Amino acid sequence: MKLHELKAAEGSRRVRNRVGRGAATGNGKTSGRGQKGQKARSGGKLRPGFEGGQLPLFRRLPKRGFTNINRKEYAIVNLDQLNKFEDGTEVTPALLVESGVVKNEKSGIKVLGNGSLDKKLTVKAHKFSASAAEAIDAKGGAHEVI
């Protein structure tokens, strides 16, 4: 088989439908747009959520909740990610960013207890879950809230 003998799979290529080219084509005159009306005109699109003038669903439902402007988002680090460091290392937020464990610090670092810790480490972070703090201390390491 040569390159010029390759054929596209049956039905994978559709012929472009040219509209407005005479009544005999089946797509002449109104070009598949039906008769008059907003959708027959050029640029005649309806905005998302428009229900023909009926009060739309998003306006019928009540507003709910609010966005807390003081919300802090913490970068999450799990225990199994800390195994990357050598025994006895002091793990700081700067070291976590530098080593690529977290992309950026955000509002701080929070250490969670997923996985298991195999090394003795001194971990400095902004928050610790109870299980994470317990696991770090159990391995002979230390956790320090900064």
UniProtKB/Swiss-Prot annotation:
SUPFAM superfamilies with a match to the protein in the record: Ribosomal proteins L15p and L18e (SSF52080)
Domain of life: Bacteria
Keywords for this protein: Ribonucleoprotein, Ribosomal protein, RNA-binding, rRNA-binding
Biased composition (Basic and acidic residues): 1-13
Cited InterPro entries: Ribosomal_uL15, Ribosomal_uL15/eL18, Ribosomal_uL15/eL18_sf, Ribosomal_uL15_bac-type, Ribosomal_uL15_CS
Compositionally biased tracts (Gly residues): 23-35
Protein's GO biological process: translation
Family annotation (Pfam families): Ribosomal_L27A
A GO cellular component entry from the record: cytosolic large ribosomal subunit
Coiled-coil residues: none
Gene Ontology terms for molecular function: rRNA binding; structural constituent of ribosome
Region (Disordered): 1-56
Gene3D superfamilies, per the entry: 3.100.10.10
Disulfide bonds: none
Record bears the keyword rRNA-binding: yes
Family: Belongs to the universal ribosomal protein uL15 family.
Subunit: Part of the 50S ribosomal subunit.
Role: Binds to the 23S rRNA.
Protein name: Large ribosomal subunit protein uL15
Organism: Staphylococcus epidermidis (strain ATCC 35984 / DSM 28319 / BCRC 17069 / CCUG 31568 / BM 3577 / RP62A)
